[in-house]
Amino acid sequence: LCGWVGAQRDQQDLLVCMITYTLLFSLTVTSFFSMPVTRYLADMLYEEQEQTILPSFWGSSSLMLVLGCTLYGLFLLVSGANLLQGLLCLWLFAEMIVNWNAMSYLTAIKDYRGILCSFLAAIALAFGLGFVLVLLLGCPVLEGMLFAVTMGYGLMMVWDVVLLYRYFPQSDESPWTFLRWVDAFLPLAFTGLCTNIGL
């Protein structure tokens, strides 16, 4: 799409780099918690303790958002991105933290169709909005496409969270119970992190 609107090659490369670094950094942050949280989910589902699932989702997401946004924000400060680009990257990063975490939960309950539908809707919105912003409204290519991608992944995030609320009941359980599993299965956490870094 960037090529169709006549974007310079360096702009296209910069957009790809921004999105790629944001996706990889968010995946790296979530990879530390992914395996212990998946183990926690499996145990809670086996014990029929579904009321603990949503609180643990928000607890783990909150922890990763605070840690990840702090680190990625510092990276963006020295990355050379301008203020708008940096804010859009940070916004996309925060969405992806929730998205990766939600995928772990949805995968645990084997809702692959829900994941696929949310992904396809995100792609459609990103391309459609990018077309409107850049081609029809004449917005700058880099910022317009980055905003469109951010909106697409935002739709995916909302879709995935709605699916989780359909499957699991809301409750007042502690959102930090999963941390006992992180502590008990710390080698799994480092395995997930090292595997992601290796990839």
Regions found by a protein language model. Give the residues of each.
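Signature of the first transmembrane helix
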Residues: L1-V29, T191-G198
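Juxtamembrane "helix-exit" motif on the non-cytosolic side of transmembrane helices
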Residues: C2-G6, L74-A81, F131-L137
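Alpha-helical transmembrane segments of multi-pass membrane proteins
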Residues: M18-S26, P55-L67, L74, V78-L106, P187-T191, ...
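Transmembrane-helix boundary and interhelical linker motifs in polytopic inner-membrane proteins
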Residues: V29-W58
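Short runs within selected transmembrane alpha-helices of multi-pass transporters and secretion channels
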Residues: S31-M35, L88-K110, I115-I123, G144-V161
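Hydrophobic/aromatic residues within transmembrane alpha-helices of membrane transport systems
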Residues: L41, L106, M151, F190-I197
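Hydrophobic alpha-helical transmembrane segments
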Residues: S118-Y165, R180-A184, T191
